[in-house]
């Protein structure tokens, strides 16, 4: 259920490092000169053919001589290499000579306000990039303004032209003239295609729109019901609904012959994108959908609902893995035994990924796309688990990680003054129930996670024997431990199977 494709790890990071530094340096140079973020008026036209492409024409609010189009997004590289026929014009429409300095980096001979170019939008080579970048097929696609328009971006007015018979679905507002008025172009996503279907539904206090295309083993109603249940649970966790009614977009993977168990997901602003392979079994397909949505829908709140900045991926990805695990248990997707198995699996993955020395969670986030992606997800999940249970134990079950999330939204909900994400989250975690020392050691610090000793006070243990880590319940529990585990779904009778497994493993290890 926790598909390994979910982990957005880097590829070819070392060979790209110098190019990344060049691109970042050039963008910083632009922001310090005459390319400050400003409004755009643009027209994007989907042009059928091979390869699939869009034509982009537009105008900046103010003229500039330095122009840039994003070339990297996370682990996706070479995005600006898809740009062709890049041209610039003055306010009077006269052409301005332009020089290409590097992929996506252009210098104009004089001030230019108008621009035009073609963008090839073949599907990305890697399945894991399919939810993160713009692409088109003959039937459908994703258009993401963050990689289509000149950067840096603020707001934009977007006129979208699509082939006859196609539809567009987006969370962005459309005015009476049919033009989309985009308040934050970095977060804007447009799904386009000839077979798009929209279904509006409610989840507790909020409404949402499910956008689907293609054929799936489950029905649209079943997908909408899953999304509604998960959204309702996440509302209860955070204490409120997102500020904007979300769109949940489900599209088939655009790569021909992609395996059915592969998928990629991302949340930008109020849009959740899930691009997935198609499994023939309804049971397997529904389990894959539920697993993906349980994690990804929480991103509508964290980080997208918080006014926090910086690289605190360890929290909004790693801790979200734990929140998804608990939500899956509440829905009945996962049992208490599944919960323990997931922790054992995460511990094994953490030990494989930690390398020759331990690093703090903030440091792992800084290096996420340079080899530390697994630490962000697996160590983040483990620290969230240990934090949650330790806080519950110290407060007699009165406080948990849920209270930390609610406090974050009280202090730093979107609309508040932007703050540094690492500082804000560390402060919130450390202020709860005597958890300051825990946070200093396992979040800010680089203390190794030794699971057997850390879970013993919680009434859990690592089972002996076997190549993989198995977490089980201790033979003897005190009343506080028993009550703590019951809050997580532990039931002594069903857990008899786990005790039998422990006994078999103990005997095997002693032979």
Identify what each model region corresponds to.
Residues 197-312:
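Juxtacatalytic substrate-recognition/specificity segment
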Residues 38-46, 52-53, 59, 82, ...:
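Beta/coil-rich, acidic/histidine-enriched accessory regions frequently appended to metallopeptidases
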Residues 78-85, 89, 153-169, 181, ...:
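Zn2+-dependent metallopeptidase catalytic core
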Residues 46-47, 75-132:
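A surface-exposed beta-strand-loop module
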Residues 1-16:
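N-terminal secretory signal peptides that target proteins for export/translocation
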Residues 70-73, 117-197:
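Extended, low-hydrophobicity, Ser/Thr/Pro/Gly-biased non-transmembrane segments
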Residues 308-382, 394-395, 406, 410-415:
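Acidic/His/Gly-enriched intrinsically disordered linker/tail segments
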Residues 21-31:
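Bacterial N-terminal signal peptides
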């Amino acid at each position: 259920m926790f598909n390994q494709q979910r982990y957005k790890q880097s590829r070819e990071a070392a060979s790209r490092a110098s190019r990344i530094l060049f691109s970042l340096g050039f963008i910083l140079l632009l922001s310090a000169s005459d390319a400050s973020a400003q409004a755009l008026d643009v027209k994007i036209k989907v042009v059928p053919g091979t390869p699939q492409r869009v034509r982009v024409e537009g105008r900046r609010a103010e003229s500039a001589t330095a122009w840039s189009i994003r070339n990297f997004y996370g682990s996706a590289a070479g995005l600006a290499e898809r740009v062709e026929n890049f041209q610039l014009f003055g306010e009077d429409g006269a052409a301005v000579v332009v020089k290409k300095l590097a992929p996506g980096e252009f210098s104009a001979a004089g001030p230019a306000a108008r621009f035009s170019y073609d963008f090839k939008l073949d599907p990305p080579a890697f399945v894991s990039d399919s939810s993160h970048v713009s692409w088109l097929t003959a039937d459908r696609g994703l258009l993401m303004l963050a990689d289509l328009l000149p950067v840096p971006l603020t707001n934009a007015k977007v006129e979208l032209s699509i082939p006859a018979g196609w539809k567009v679905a987006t969370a962005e507002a459309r005015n009476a003239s049919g033009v989309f008025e985009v308040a934050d172009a970095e977060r804007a996503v447009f799904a386009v295609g000839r077979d798009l279907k929209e279904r509006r539904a409610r989840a507790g206090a909020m409404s949402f729109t499910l956008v689907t295309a293609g054929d799936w083993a489950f029905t649209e109603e079943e997908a909408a019901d899953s999304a509604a249940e998960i959204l309702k649970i996440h509302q209860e966790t955070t204490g409120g609904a997102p500020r904007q009614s979300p769109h949940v977009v489900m599209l088939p993977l655009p790569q021909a012959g992609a395996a059915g168990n592969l998928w990629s997901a991302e949340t930008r602003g109020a849009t959740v994108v899930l691009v997935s392979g198609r499994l023939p079994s309804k049971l397997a397909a529904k389990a894959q959908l539920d697993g993906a949505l349980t994690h990804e829908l929480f991103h509508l709140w964290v980080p997208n609902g918080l006014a926090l900045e910086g690289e605190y991926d360890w929290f909004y990805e790693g801790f979200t893995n734990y929140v998804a695990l608990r939500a899956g248990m509440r829905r009945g997707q996962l049992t208490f035994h599944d919960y323990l198995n997931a922790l054992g699996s995460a511990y094994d993955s953490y030990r494989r990924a930690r390398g020759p020395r331990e690093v703090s969670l903030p440091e792992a986030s800084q290096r996420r796309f340079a080899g530390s992606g697994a630490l962000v997800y697996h160590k983040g999940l483990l620290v969230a688990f240990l934090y949650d249970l330790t806080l519950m134990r110290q407060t007699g079950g009165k406080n948990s990680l849920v209270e930390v999330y609610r406090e974050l939204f009280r202090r730093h909900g979107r609309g508040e003054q932007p703050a540094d994400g690492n500082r804000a989250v560390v402060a919130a975690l450390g202020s709860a129930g005597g958890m300051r020392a825990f946070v200093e050691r396992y979040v800010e610090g680089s203390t190794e996670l030794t699971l057997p000793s850390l879970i013993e006070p919680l009434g859990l243990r690592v089972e002996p024997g076997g190549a993989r880590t198995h977490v089980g319940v201790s033979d003897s529990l005190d009343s506080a431990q028993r009550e703590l585990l019951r809050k997580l779904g532990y039931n002594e009778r069903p857990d008899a199977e786990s005790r039998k497994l422990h006994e078999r493993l103990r005997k095997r290890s002693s032979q």
